[in-house]
From Swiss-Prot:
The keyword Amino-acid biosynthesis applies. This is 3-isopropylmalate dehydrogenase. It holds the Pfam family Iso_dh. Mg(2+) binds at residues 232, 256, 260. The lineage of its organism: Bacteria, Bacillati, Cyanobacteriota, Cyanophyceae, Synechococcales. It is found in: Cytoplasm. Belongs to the isocitrate and isopropylmalate dehydrogenases family. LeuB type 1 subfamily. It comes from Synechococcus sp. (strain JA-2-3B'a(2-13)) (Cyanobacteria bacterium Yellowstone B-Prime). GO terms for biological process: L-leucine biosynthetic process. It catalyses: (2R,3S)-3-isopropylmalate + NAD(+) = 4-methyl-2-oxopentanoate + CO2 + NADH.
Length: 371
């Protein structure tokens, strides 16, 4: 995980608004980040790039070379959302979502962090009981570049008798496991010092190697309490009693599933940020939710996940943890005041649009400074 020196007071950020609600939530995210930067005495130098469907429409490529170069030369990459139903008929390599794979590969990102925190004001938004939900504060650390999505051989093959079979291969090297394990242990060391590694070591040899290497890396972090769960039990425990978890470490496929399951604990995917990190270079920060083309341009989107992704950027790439804290406190303050976008609205709350939610967040930052 890379961090810039805190003495470098101007940070170059690549902003990728993308598709659907992306431009709306990006405007809010940037406004909040600029506000906290002014308060804390540093500056953000924004550069805008094309990605996804917006890039395809203008260039014929969902990830233009100039966008990737811009991202590689920045201190961090701030992404909103890509994708739209109208691109579904395109060949796979031209679809907006393919840009994310290219961006991750081009930036050397292998660790995806999904924080899941339930704000006290939103306990009632979850479909689970309040006593199960209240106080959840966990992070899923998912390996991004290995496992069954990338292993070879892969494909659909036809044998001599004309019978077809589909093949995918789950592969992890020791080096791949070691580097993602270190990211998770470092994170756990700065949190509540509990790490749960999730695998399927009772059946899969690849998981047996995974567990062996995680145990080996654990020796470097004696202060972190390590436990292991099989993926099926982990999925069950995440719903049964999620507060038992601090940091969850797992591979690409299992992480894909568990992170979405964990996302729904909160009751709104519109609240959840994510970070994707590499060994060096800029990190990528984006909300967990998609581009929601059905509500694009209607001022209905919830910008909080975008805003909280900005807080992660401040924390992990720009070495500005106090600024990140301020943003998170502003979100909590606005929720405590009863303001809700349509996805979170309930009787007795005050309904606001995307833009007004952004204005309330900036106002909350100003109130913090005044105090």
């Amino acid at each position: 995980m890379s961090t810039s020196s805190s003495t470098a007071r101007t940070y170059r950020i690549t902003a990728l608004a993308g598709d659907g609600i992306g431009p709306e939530i990006m405007r809010v995210g940037r406004a909040v980040l600029d506000a906290v930067a002014r308060q804390m005495g540093f500056a953000l130098q924004w550069q805008e790039g094309l990605i996804g469907g917006a890039a395809y429409d203008q260039t014929g490529d969902p990830l233009p070379a100039e966008t990737l170069k811009m991202a590689q030369e920045s201190d961090a990459v701030y992404l909103a959302a890509v994708g739209d139903f109208k691109y579904d008929a395109l060949p796979p390599e031209k679809r907006p979502e393919r840009a994310l794979l290219g961006l991750r590969a081009g930036l050397g990102l292998f660790a995806n962090l999904r924080p899941v925190k339930v704000f006290p004001q939103l306990v009632g938004a979850s479909s689970l009981k309040p006593e199960v939900i209240a106080g959840i504060d966990l992070v899923v650390v998912r390996e991004l570049t290995g496992g069954i999505y990338f292993g070879q051989p892969k494909g659909i093959f036809t044998d001599a008798q004309g019978s077809r079979r589909g093949v995918n291969t789950m592969v992890y090297s020791e080096a791949e496991v070691d580097r993602i394990a270190r990211v998770a242990f470092e994170l756990a060391r700065k949190r509540r010092r509990k790490l749960c590694s999730v695998d399927k070591a009772n059946v899969l040899e690849v998981s047996q190697l995974w567990r062996e290497r995680v145990n080996a890396i654990a020796a470097e972090y004696p202060e972190v309490e390590l436990s292991h769960l099989y993926i099926d039990n982990a999925a069950m425990q995440l719903v049964r009693w999620p507060k038992q978890f601090d940091v969850i470490l797992t591979g690409n496929l299992f992480g894909d599933i568990l992170s979405d399951e964990a996302a729904m604990l909160t009751g709104s995917i519109g609240m959840l940020p994510s970070a994707s990190l590499g060994s060096s270079g800029p990190g990528l920060y984006e909300p967990v939710h998609g581009s929601a083309p059905d509500i694009a341009g209607q001022d209905k989107a919830n910008p909080i996940a975008q805003v909280l992704s900005g807080a992660l950027m401040l924390r992990y790439s720009l070495d500005q943890p106090q600024a990140a804290d301020r943003i998170e406190q502003a979100v909590e303050a606005v929720l405590a005041q009863g303001y809700r976008t349509p996805d979170l609205y309930s009787e007795g709350m005050t309904l606001v649009g995307c833009q007004e939610m952004g204005e309330k967040l900036v106002a909350a930052l100003s109130q913090q400074q005044a105090q």
